[in-house]
Amino acid sequence: KEEELKKVVERNIKGTLNGAGVISFSETHRNLLMWAHYADNHEGICIEVETDWSKSKPRLYDTLSNALHSFQRVKYDTRRADYSDIVEINVQNQNKITIDLCMKHLTLKSDEWMYEKEHRNIMSFLEADYVKLKPGKTIPKELRNRINKSKIKYLDNGYTTTECSDLEFFDNVFESNLFMYLSKVPANKIKRIYLGARFNEKDKIINAFKNPNHPLHHVEVFKCEINNSRFEIDAIRVY
């Protein structure tokens, strides 16, 4: 009986992980390595959002626990996550064990990444606002036919998910690994924008935000500069 439940839990874990997307955030906007790696060597931007931003989004599918929809601090370790923690499974606790082990897997990274100070917002792929074909990828004919037959609205090599309830179709999409799953952040949940030290369109951003009708009129804008005496970033408010 317990062996059967363990197999059920393992199957549920794999199913949950296959349908889970991770949106990564950091506690800091000042890390030099992250500006180099994730912001095109200081030419990009860093956006600060409210920690409850995803709670304001409508829940279209109840495929993951509410716990997976909140910010989760990433833990760092030298050992990978495994399923050895599956013990004393019964019908009453199998769902909790599934979620706990999924969280362990989705919030664990190697010690080498500790400098990122990462927090993760974990959501179902089904709750993506927009799904876009990865650069250089093409959709196989069979999958394209499925898309054409569904109630999906095409948008620039992608489609919106709100018009399709064909879960089997989405299973095919997930397994194809052809798409990026994107989530919109409500404008009122954006607090600050940090422009990289080599970002060259500062005036364009400021002039746009000055318009009282602009959805980001309320957002504070900072220009980052590399400190000349310390290995640090200085953020100077420009709007």
Regions found by a protein language model. Give the residues of each.
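Catalytic-core loop-and-flanking beta/alpha module that positions acidic residues
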Residues: 1-239
